[in-house]
């Protein structure tokens, strides 16, 4: 409890610098990441995760960290959904908030599962649920904010004539525009080659953030643009889909490292 209160007290300062609306991918996007991860688990890891989560799948628990935002007891977790890397800086060269960020939280959760000593998570099930969500968040380019516009939340825009903002466009508007269920979406995008899986899973959590930072630089519409629609979807949907796929593959990589021997791939 003392740890939670300490984090809670620091949130007010940290949220001045970081994106305030941080729901990551919308519900469909997070479920896509979770299901892709399940598809790439080794058999031993799949059994271990099922034993930890019970009847809940990775796809269905991947939104847990957004759902608990309605419970003020978990407000200290709000800054853990994102990080800030200003233009021209790297994660190593920029300041990091005391209350934590998505990169530090992912790394801490991995350590807690490895050691079975839970500090920021209450237990192993919560740690797995948090990983399922936060790995997805980090692959949403605007969850690596530039420190000036709350991760694109301040960039107001119309999406097919409806009021939105750039953060929301990437969280959910682009995904919802495809009019697919999460299982249909997974069937569409989950086609990584063995080489891609290997390369993506070898990269570090900081690498993932710096990928998002690089993508972020190219997804802002011109300053004079007031509405987005078909052309923006055409230009960016392949990038978004790749980030969903990478998030799922990398989540599977973490869970395989934690719970499986590398030779035992799920059939």
Task: Set out the residue ranges of the language-model regions.
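Bacterial N-terminal signal peptides that target proteins for export
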Residues: 2-13
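N-terminal signal peptide c-region/cleavage motif recognized by signal peptidases
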Residues: 19-21
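N-terminal, motif-rich segments that launch catalysis or mediate targeting to/interaction with membranes
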Residues: 23-134, 141-267
